[in-house]
Each structure stands twice: as structure tokens, then as C-alpha cells.
Amino acid sequence: MNTIWIAVGALTLLGLVFGAILGYASRRFAVEDDPVVEKIDAILPQSQCGQCGYPGCRPYAEAVGLQGEKINRCAPGGEAVMLKMAELLNVEPQPCDGEEQQAAPVRMLAVIDENNCIGCTKCIQACPVDAIVGATRAMHTVMSDLCTGCNLCVDPCPTHCIELRPVNETPDSWKWDLNTIPVRIIPVEQHA
């Protein structure tokens, strides 16, 4: 019984010593992130599609915040993201020109021709937001609520059964743009 308490005490002491070492190391060797990069990264849609020329949203945010990259390269975010970044960085909004892919004015949605789908799962692997579901050698389908229309699933398809189609706005698919609604703060007097 005495050896059990010695073992418990030794393990507790080791845990405390190593915990203190890890705590010291985490503070001593901590890397501070740039708060501007964090804010830019929060603005981006996090689709990790690579249409901006960077492997994901975080590297693009670092390029904009630290290297002065253009703010109009995010195709899925379009003009709304560009305007938010321009406001954050206090720069002039930049219209999309011929070099950058201009965001489509209509939301695009990937559609799979299920009769020609062979179930190879290449589109599932290419989708950055997991909007395509299906199993090996079974037909796949796109979940329209998750699809960003980034076009990354079209090229890997060996049977070319995926295409992007515009989504027609219906009362069910239309959403309020909350950034355009004017909001006023009305002061309220409190009576004692």
C-alpha cells in the first residue's frame, strides 16, 4: 500500500514539474500574431478555395496585412469582402479588373449529373467546404446550402458530369443583406 502512494506522489510531482516547464515554454517562446491579419482572416469566407492565388484564406490574409497584396482577389467573398477589407485597412476600394476573377453577380451552385457519375470521389476530395456527399462507386450529390460555387470540383471529374449553374433567387433562397440595412441607436432615458 505504501508503494502505491509513493508511485502516486512521484507521478504527481513529475506532472507538476513538466507542467511548469511547458507553461514557462509556452510564455517564453510564444509567437504573437498581427491583430490586423487576424481581423482580415475573420472577414474572409474561409472557403480555402485558392482562387486568390494563395493556398487558403489565412495566407491571403497575411499577404494583404503584411505585404500589401491587393484586396480584391477573393472571388467567393466578392465585393462585400473587398469593401470590408478596404474599410478595415483605410484604403480605397479596388474594382475587380481583368487579372482577378470577378465574383459572379449571381450565386453559382455545382450540379452533378447523377446518371453519369461513376462515384470516384475526386470531387469530394477537391471540395474545400465538404458540400459534396456520396460514397465510392455510388452517385454523389451537392448540398446546395454549403456549396460556395468555387469551381474546384469541376476539373477533377473524369466524366465531366459536374457543372456550375446560377441559382435563381426565389423567396426560399433569397437572403437579407444585413450590411445594407441602416441601423440607428436610439438613446433610451431611464426614469428613476
Swiss-Prot record:
GO terms for cellular component: plasma membrane. Pfam families: Fer4_21, FeS. [4Fe-4S] cluster 1 binds at C49, C52, C57, C74. It is found in: Cell inner membrane. Residues 32-91 form the 4Fe-4S domain. The keyword Ligase does not apply. PROSITE patterns: 4FE4S (PS51656), 4FE4S_FER_1 (PS00198), 4FE4S_FER_2 (PS51379). GO terms for biological process: electron transport chain. Binds 3 [4Fe-4S] clusters. Its main location: membrane. It comes from the Bacteria. InterPro entries: 4Fe-4S_dom, 4Fe4S_Fe-S-bd, 4Fe4S_Fe_S_CS, 4Fe4S_Ferredoxin_RnfB, Elect_transpt_cplx_RnfB/RsxB, RnfB/RsxB_Proteobac. [4Fe-4S] cluster 2 binds at C117, C120, C123, C157. One of its GO terms (molecular function) is electron transfer activity. Residues 1-26 are annotated as: Hydrophobic. Its EC number is 7.-.-.-. Its cofactor is [4Fe-4S] cluster. Keywords: 4Fe-4S, Cell inner membrane, Cell membrane, Electron transport, Iron, Iron-sulfur, Membrane, Metal-binding, Repeat, Translocase, Transport. [4Fe-4S] cluster 3 binds at C127, C147, C150, C153. The keyword Acetylation does not apply. Residues 108-137, 138-167 form the 4Fe-4S ferredoxin-type domain. Part of a membrane-bound complex that couples electron transfer with translocation of ions across the membrane. Required to maintain the reduced state of SoxR. HAMAP family: RsxB_RnfB (MF_00463). Belongs to the 4Fe4S bacterial-type ferredoxin family. RnfB subfamily. This is Ion-translocating oxidoreductase complex subunit B.
